[in-house]
Regions:
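Hydrophobic alpha-helical segments characteristic of transmembrane helices
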Residues: 1-51, 235, 242-248, 367, ...
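Membrane-embedded transport module
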Residues: 3, 7, 263-309, 324, ...
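Bateman (tandem CBS) regulatory domains
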Residues: 18-22, 98-101, 209-217, 232-237, ...
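Cytosolic catalytic regions of ATP/NTP-dependent phosphoryl-transfer enzymes
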Residues: 63-213, 219, 232-233, 241, ...
């Protein structure tokens, strides 16, 4: 409006001045911003999908770039989720094999079921006919496994077979305290080697107390080969990784160390009942954690100012996934409920995919900052050139052959610059690759898109381009003529935009 009034004052009321003012108004507003922003997000989400990370909520893209803590499950995320029995330690191997088959919901023929139970069946099938054993000893009643009691019971005509965590079954054995303590120590020693230790027991009728010990099953779920490198990359990026698992503390610590995670401080679900929020922040590995306790871990980390990405696969994980800044669900073994509330779904259930998603999230954010810096700096330079150019032409008395005031750029030139040399480079910047994004710490969650350095870039480059263009407009008319000076100014502005795109 000010330039329109200035034009009327100097040039008089004319259609040329109005057209020029309208063109400048169009150029001053970055109308291509919504399209470029949408394209940047869409292409970034598409790149994530190619890397097996499906974004369910676009807000997660921004949050991924700010993640400071990843709270990850162990089984299937850090490990291959392929349980194989390494050894059966039993005083009664025949009955222990029956327990492995009968206290089991998996189906070996179809491969359906929990990976641990499938591993038990694969091992038992070496020594007996699984289907024949199940036909001869039908299930009469059962108590399904639950994270609250940590064991499963199945009653058959032979009696009750139980399998579960050592700490859940050993106290139920008909053994003196000294013998129970020895079994606890033995289970802990095996777990410290990275084995998942499963206890087996037998009881008469439907008894769950006074049981007979059938032995330990040692299973191994090897870490995914790509996880150690992914952990190293994300730690270098300033993101802390903590393990949250339902497994034995010693097993969890062994796996954490094997993949390169910190594992100095280990706490169990029972410890969480007494730990303060400040003490909780120091824990590296959370073991024997119930799903509902994940929510408290997330809230304590967020209370300390952390931006948390939490993984989960069960129905009971939903509150923690919803509360986390980035809820990450498993696409292969996750429940429908967990996938519904999550912000990000891992198609391969792989920890390395979380790191890839964080890398893409940071890259998308940096690209948005780049094209914002570019668009605002170019728009600022155009406004300054036109506004100050009119003043300069009026002061120097620069007029064309028809006696009209020499404008720095014509309306058509302004629109051409705005369409071609503003919009297209901005689109290119939205697709830029940023290979070093994981070499820097996470950005603060509340940091603005145009931060201090970005604003300085906009002001300095905008003023520099405008100053150089005005210099051409001031000195060239005497040497090459008014029209050539105007043309040179236009070409400088057009080519200069492309040059400064590299600096954005």
């Amino acid at each position: 409006l000010g330039l329109l009034l200035l034009g009327f004052l100097v040039e008089g009321v004319s259609a040329k001045v109005v057209l020029f003012a309208v063109a400048l108004a169009v150029a001053a507003v970055p109308e291509g911003l919504p399209a470029v922003l949408t394209l940047a997000l869409a292409l970034g989400v598409e790149r994530m999908a190619r890397r097996k990370a499906v974004v369910r909520r676009l807000s997660a893209v921004e949050a991924l770039g700010s993640v400071t803590v990843i709270a990850t499950d162990k089984t299937g995320t850090l490990t291959e989720n392929r349980m194989e029995v390494q050894e059966l330690l039993s005083p009664d191997p025949e009955k222990a094999l029956l327990a492995m088959v009968l206290c089991n919901d998996a189906d070996l023929a179809t491969g359906a079921g929990d990976p641990l139970e499938l591993g038990l069946l694969r091992y038992a099938s070496r020594f007996l006919d699984v289907e024949r054993v199940r036909r001869e000893h039908p299930r009469l009643s059962e108590r399904p496994f639950d994270s609250a009691w940590k064991f499963m019971r199945v009653t058959t005509p032979l009696g009750s077979f139980l399998k579960g965590a050592p700490e859940a079954l050993i106290p139920r054995l008909a053994l003196p305290q000294e013998e129970q303590a020895r079994l606890f120590e033995e289970a802990g020693a095996h777990a410290a080697k990275g084995f998942r230790v499963l206890a087996l027991a037998f009881g008469e009728g439907e008894r769950e107390e006074g049981l007979r010990f059938l032995g330990f099953v040692l299973l191994l779920d090897p870490p995914r080969p790509e996880v150690p490198e992914a952990v190293a990359r994300v730690l270098k990026a300033g993101v802390r990784v903590v393990m949250v698992t339902g497994d034995h503390p010693a097993t969890a610590r062994a796996i954490a160390r094997r993949v390169g995670m910190p594992a100095e401080v280990v706490a169990t679900g029972e410890d969480l009942e007494t730990l303060s929020d400040e003490e909780l922040l120091k824990v590296d590995v959370f073991a024997r954690v119930r799903p509902e306790q994940k929510l408290r871990i997330v809230e304590a980390l967020q209370k300390a100012g952390e931006v948390v990405a939490m993984t989960g696969d069960g129905v009971n994980d939903a509150p923690a996934l919803k509360r986390a800044d980035v809820g990450v669900a498993m696409g292969q073994r996750g429940s429908d409920v967990s996938r519904e509330v999550a912000d990000l779904v891992l198609l391969d259930d792989n920890f390395a995919t979380i790191v890839a998603a964080i890398e893409e999230g940071r890259s998308i954010y940096e690209n948005i900052q780049k094209f914002l810096r570019f668009l605002f700096s170019t728009n600022l330079s155009e406004v300054l050139v036109v506004a100050l150019g009119m003043v300069l032409a009026a002061l120097l008395g620069l007029r064309d052959e028809a006696g009209h005031l020499l404008l720095p750029l014509t309306a058509v030139q302004i629109l051409w610059i705005n369409l071609v040399t503003d919009g297209l480079p901005a689109l290119a910047l939205s697709l830029d690759r940023n290979p070093g994004v994981l070499d820097r710490p996470p950005r603060p969650k509340e940091s603005p898109l145009l931060d201090g350095p970005s604003l300085r870039f906009v002001l300095l480059t905008g003023a520099l381009k405008a100053g150089l263009a005005l210099g051409l407009l001031g000195f060239l008319p005497g040497a090459v003529g008014l029209e050539a000076a105007q043309s040179a100014t236009f070409h400088f502005m057009a080519i200069g935009q492309l040059f400064f795109a590299y600096a954005a």
